[in-house]
């Protein structure tokens, strides 16, 4: 059986960042990482990165009712080409995952995906900052992440309840923290580069003040 040698790539793993060869056995598993390795087939990957698959924590994928957005198929195809093996599907209008039925529908659509899709439910109904979604009902379907990506959660009582329920159901919250008054006109991080390009920047304090 043949062994594939990925020669001269940039290896990123828990050991660090280094140039090395990677030998893949006939079962498709990594057999060895090092210098000067031999294999029955060799692929020159100089200038390329070899690593575990990336995970996109903020992906927007449209459904059948949202034809203008990227579809499950096209979105995951782009992800795979970029080295991503999983994407977290964030809930946004008009595809809002704020009940068990919408979760199941998205999971069915995910069968068309070319990589793993991790469904993130909406922490609030209709992505409205004022009303908490049924976190228990949604988490019972297997969802372990919930996002608050819409309007800022200025209703602190709702925010408190969401955080308490997240502990009860052992779920992870994904917050988009940005003060709209400080970031409304910004298009990139505020700094020397934004000044040089003449592009309005978003100051770090816009996120810090929300946290």
Model features per residue range: what roles?
Residues 16, 28, 59-61, 179:
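Short, glycine/acidic-enriched loop or turn micro-motifs at the edges of active sites
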Residues 1-52:
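Histidine-rich, glycine-flanked metal-binding segment
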Residues 41, 96-98, 128, 156, ...:
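Short secondary-structure boundary/hinge segments and terminal tails
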Residues 57-70, 91, 118-131, 150, ...:
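Active-site mouth loops of central-metabolism enzymes
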Residues 104, 131-211:
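Histidine/acidic residue-rich metal-binding segments in metalloenzymes
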Residues 46-110:
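Metal-associated gating/positioning segment near the N- to mid-region
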Residues 74-97, 113-125, 139-154, 170-178:
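Divalent metal-dependent hydrolysis catalytic cores, especially in the metallo-beta-lactamase
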Residues 1-2, 37-40, 46, 50, ...:
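Short coil/turn connectors at secondary-structure junctions
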């Amino acid at each position: 059986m043949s062994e594939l040698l990925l020669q001269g790539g940039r290896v990123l793993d828990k050991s660090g960042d280094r140039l090395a060869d990677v030998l893949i056995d006939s079962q498709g598993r990594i057999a060895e990482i090092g210098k000067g390795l031999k294999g029955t087939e060799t692929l020159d990957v100089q200038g390329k990165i070899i690593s575990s698959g990336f995970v996109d924590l903020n992906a927007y994928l449209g459904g059948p009712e949202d034809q203008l957005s990227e579809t499950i198929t096209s979105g995951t195809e782009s992800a795979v080409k970029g080295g991503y093996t999983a994407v977290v599907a964030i809930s946004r209008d008009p595809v809002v995952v704020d009940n068990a039925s919408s979760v199941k529908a998205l999971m069915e659509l995910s069968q068309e995906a070319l990589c793993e899709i991790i469904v993130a439910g909406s922490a609030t109904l209709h992505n409205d900052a004022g009303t908490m979604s049924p976190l228990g009902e949604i988490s019972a379907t297997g969802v372990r992440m919930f996002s608050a990506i819409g309007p800022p959660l200025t209703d602190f009582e709702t925010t408190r309840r969401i955080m308490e329920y997240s502990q009860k159901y052992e779920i992870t919250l994904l917050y988009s923290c940005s003060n709209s008054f400080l970031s409304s006109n910004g298009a990139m991080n505020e700094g020397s580069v934004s000044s040089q390009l003449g592009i309005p920047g978003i100051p770090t304090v816009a996120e810090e003040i929300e946290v």
